């Protein structure tokens, strides 16, 4: 059968399954595709296909991630599932798979475990906006009170991490029984997807956000002026609009006098476009890679921030030795390296550590030598001599 052309008539949402190892994330993912395939809304995939996810490289870090897609009556979903716990940590920190929401899978037989907590914390820190709980393996628990206890415990746990624990839907499912085709459990998968449709908000489209383009290159065109090139990250920019040049040096205001793409002149550039912007009154030496062009007043540069960081193992091309507070690497932010200092750090659970070993996950405070347009939720890499030794996400702006 020929593959049908994918219809882009439904809003697109990115989600994923998170939760403790062996609580059934991959089985549930397979069950969702199987149940929705009966309505022609997915291609059924079995456990082995999803579990045998190929390795991907994101910013020099190897991550195993499975991608499946399916639709409900109202939406199209791209869904990520990772086989290993370390893959989740790397995935969420590097933003390899940006999630608009997640299905937290908790086995009713076990309740919340160590990684359940870690994934909820990670979701909070990297800015996953909404969760839905799938209480899995409910076919294996006869005692209704036991299930209620697990549900209460999860709600309290979610609340303790600043998620709305009382309001988040908790749906009792059995991924395995749904795959085996038991009608009652298939219905529960439908219930889960109804909850996901209702509780995970549609993401604001990049084009509706304020304009931002990171400068990749700068040219000077005789008689016309200075052109900055890059990919528009969000929003749109029109000819004649005032924009600010932010980062590294003092913020400057300029007017976009031309927008070019593939050597053609356009009236406007929008999110996703690779463009050249002609800037009025700007010399080639006034602007450099690493600065950003933004909608006037939409962003301020910062030097000090907190971040969640995954430090690469030696086998991943990371450092072979630990580092200590005061370590001065480069922070690769959007398009450029900025020297900075890791002034303080703790272990990811907030406990004090003296040094950071390759393979660790830490919370750190970083201070850059020059102000840059950093924002909460933004991804960065930590580099040393041009090679990546860590990946992070900005969890808080300090100044």
Swiss-Prot record:
G2: annotated segments: 60-64
Transmembrane annotation, as ranges: none
Domain of life: Bacteria
Family matches, as Pfam families: GTP_EFTU, GTP_EFTU_D2, GTP_EFTU_D3
Location in the cell: Cytoplasm
GO molecular function: GTP binding; GTPase activity; translation elongation factor activity
GO annotation, cellular component aspect: cytosol
PANTHER family in the cross-refs: ELONGATION FACTOR TU, MITOCHONDRIAL, ELONGATION FACTOR TU-RELATED
Protein name in UniProt: Elongation factor Tu
Organism: Prochlorococcus marinus (strain NATL1A)
Gene designation per UniProt: tuf
């Amino acid at each position: 059968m020929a593959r049908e052309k994918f219809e882009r008539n439904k809003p697109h949402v990115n989600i994923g399954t998170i939760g403790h190892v062996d609580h059934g994330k991959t089985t549930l993912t397979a069950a969702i595709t199987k149940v929705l395939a009966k309505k022609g809304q997915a291609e059924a995939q079995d456990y082995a296909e999803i579990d045998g996810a190929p390795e991907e490289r994101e910013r020099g870090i190897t991550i195993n991630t499975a991608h499946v897609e399916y639709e409900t009556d109202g939406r199209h979903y791209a869904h990520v599932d990772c086989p290993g716990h370390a893959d989740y940590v790397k995935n969420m920190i590097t933003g390899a798979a940006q999630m608009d929401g997640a299905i937290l899978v908790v086995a009713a037989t076990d309740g919340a475990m160590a990684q359940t907590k870690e994934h909820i914390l990670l979701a909070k820190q990297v800015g996953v906006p909404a969760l839905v709980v799938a209480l899995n393996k409910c076919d294996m628990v006869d005692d209704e009170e036991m299930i209620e206890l697990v549900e209460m415990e999860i709600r309290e746990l979610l609340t303790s991490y600043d998620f709305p624990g009382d309001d988040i839907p908790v749906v009792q499912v059995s991924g395995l029984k749904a795959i085996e085709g038991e009608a009652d459990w298939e219905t529960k998968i439908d219930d889960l997807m109804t909850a996901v449709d209702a509780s995970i908000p549609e993401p604001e489209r990049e084009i509706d956000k304020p304009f931002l383009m990171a400068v990749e290159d700068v040219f000077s065109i005789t008689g016309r002026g200075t052109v900055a090139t890059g990919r528009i990250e969000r929003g749109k920019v029109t000819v004649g609009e005032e924009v600010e040049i932010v980062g590294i040096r003092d913020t400057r205001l300029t007017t976009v006098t031309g927008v070019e793409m593939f050597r053609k002149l356009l009236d406007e550039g929008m999110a996703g476009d690779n463009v050249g912007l002609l800037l009025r009154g700007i010399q080639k030496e006034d602007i450099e890679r690493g600065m950003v062009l933004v909608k006037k007043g939409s962003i301020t540069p910062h030097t000090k921030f907190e971040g969640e960081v995954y430090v690469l193992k030696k086998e991943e091309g990371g450092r072979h030795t630990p580092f200590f507070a005061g370590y001065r690497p480069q922070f690769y932010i959007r398009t450029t390296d900025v020297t900075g200092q890791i002034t303080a750090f703790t272990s990811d659970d907030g406990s004090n550590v003296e040094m950071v070993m390759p393979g660790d996950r830490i919370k750190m405070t970083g201070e850059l030598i020059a102000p840059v347009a950093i924002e909460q939720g933004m991804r960065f890499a930590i580099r040393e001599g041009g090679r990546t030794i860590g990946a992070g996400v900005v969890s808080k702006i300090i100044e």
